[in-house]
């Protein structure tokens, strides 16, 4: 439900892009936007991707 707060945050988790972005696949999740997440790649570039486009490494 929308009124309940759950602390299942994936912010700070390492992830791997399924489809590489300009040769880069590894990054860190820095924010969540519902179905999309913001990923900072190892080259410093920040991109917005859908959750099903990444593998989250716990």
Which residues does each predicted region cover?
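Basic/aromatic-rich interaction segments and small domains that mediate binding to polyanionic partners
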Residues: 2-58
């Amino acid at each position: 439900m929308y009124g309940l707060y759950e602390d299942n945050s994936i912010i700070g988790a390492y992830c791997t892009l399924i489809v590489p972005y300009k040769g880069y696949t590894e990054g860190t999740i820095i924010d969540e936007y519902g179905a999309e997440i913001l990923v900072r790649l190892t080259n410093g570039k920040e991109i917005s991707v859908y959750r099903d486009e990444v593998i989250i490494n716990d």
